[in-house]
UniProtKB/Swiss-Prot annotation:
CDD domains the UniProt entry points to: Cyanase_C
NCBIfam families: cynS, PRK02866.1
Keyword Lyase belongs to the record: yes
SMART domains: Cyanate_lyase
Protein name in the entry: Cyanate hydratase
Tree of life domain: Bacteria
Family matches, as Gene3D superfamilies: Cyanate lyase, C-terminal domain (3.30.1160.10), lambda repressor-like DNA-binding domains (1.10.260.40)
EC nos: 4.2.1.104
């Protein structure tokens, strides 16, 4: 998978400015995961958000237009090769159908929205090794009968 040029530019500017995604969350008022998705062109910013980001990163204002364009979503191969991303694929391979069954028992026949959706990543201290806590919250959408 090749990283888009604009993504490389944004990541380098973030590094050059000594900023984290959490720092940018405070500046933009958006979740750090959403901001990372914006960097990878999996989300689009409002003009105001793009201006704030470009200013924080010290980039030329011409980047505002790129950040406000609607992106083509979905990045990378169907089976991911990055080890961290592959773990999520593996989790879905193992637990996808069990999660689906539990959701359907609780909500009925439908899906969890990835549009009306939030995702948070937290670090949990553990004496056996720090843990990654990921919380996904998506609106339940029942299938329509007609």
């Amino acid at each position: 998978m090749s990283i888009p040029e604009i993504t490389q530019t944004l990541l380098q500017a973030k590094k050059d400015q000594g900023l984290s995604f959490a720092d940018l969350e405070a500046i933009l008022g958006r979740n750090e995961v959403w901001i990372a998705a914006l960097f990878y062109r999996q989300a689009s910013a409002s003009e105001e958000e793009a201006k704030l980001l470009v200013e924080a990163l010290g980039l030329d204002p011409s980047y505002i237009q790129h950040l406000t364009e609607y992106p083509i979503k979905g990045l990378g191969p169907i089976v991911p090769t990055d080890p961290l991303i592959y773990r999520f694929y593996e989790i879905m391979q193992v637990y996808g159908f069990p999660i689906k069954q539990v959701i359907q028992e609780k909500f009925g026949d439908g899906i969890m929205s990835a549009i009306d959706f939030t995702l948070d990543v937290e670090k949990e201290a553990d004496p056996k090794g720090d843990r990654v806590k990921i919380t996904m919250s998506g609106k339940f959408l029942p299938y329509k009968k007609w």
